[in-house]
A protein has these predicted regions:
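Amphipathic alpha-helical assembly/interaction segments
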Residues: 1-118
Length: 118
C-alpha cells in the first residue's frame, strides 16, 4: 500500500501548494488576506486527501467531497488574482491545468467509492 505522500493525487496537490506559495510571494501586501486564504485552502486540500486515505467508505467520500469544494474555491481565487493582474498568464495556465487534473483525480477517487458500494 502506498503512503499518502506517494499518491499521485497528493503530489499534484502539493505541486499546486508550491506554485501558490510562489504566487503569494510575488503579490502586493494589500492582497495578503486573499493569498493567505488561498494557501490555507490548498493546505486543506492536502489534509483532506491525507485523511481520506486513512478512511474507507462514506467517510472517505466525505473528505474527498471537502477536497473538491476547496479545489473549486482555489480555482475561483486564482481567477480573481489573474483578472487583477497578479498572476502571470503562464503561471495561471499551469495552475488551471493542475487544478483541473486534481479535481478529476479526486472526483474519480470519490466516484470509485460509490461504484464499489462502500
Amino acid at each position: 500500500m502506498r503512503t499518502t505522500a506517494q499518491l499521485p493525487v497528493y503530489r499534484t496537490a502539493a505541486n499546486i501548494l508550491f506554485l501558490l506559495t510562489e504566487v503569494a510571494r510575488d503579490v502586493p501586501r494589500k492582497l495578503l488576506r486573499l493569498t493567505d486564504r488561498v494557501l490555507l485552502d490548498a493546505s486543506e486540500v492536502l489534509k483532506t486527501i491525507a485523511v481520506a486515505n486513512e478512511f474507507r467508505g462514506a467517510e472517505r467520500g466525505y473528505y474527498l467531497s471537502l477536497a473538491l469544494a476547496n479545489i473549486q474555491v482555489i480555482k475561483t481565487n486564482v481567477g480573481i488574482m489573474k483578472n487583477m493582474g497578479f498572476i502571470r498568464k503562464e503561471r495561471q495556465t499551469l495552475l488551471a491545468s493542475l487544478l483541473k487534473s486534481l479535481a478529476a483525480q479526486v472526483a474519480a477517487w470519490r466516484d470509485s467509492i460509490k461504484s464499489e458500494g462502500q
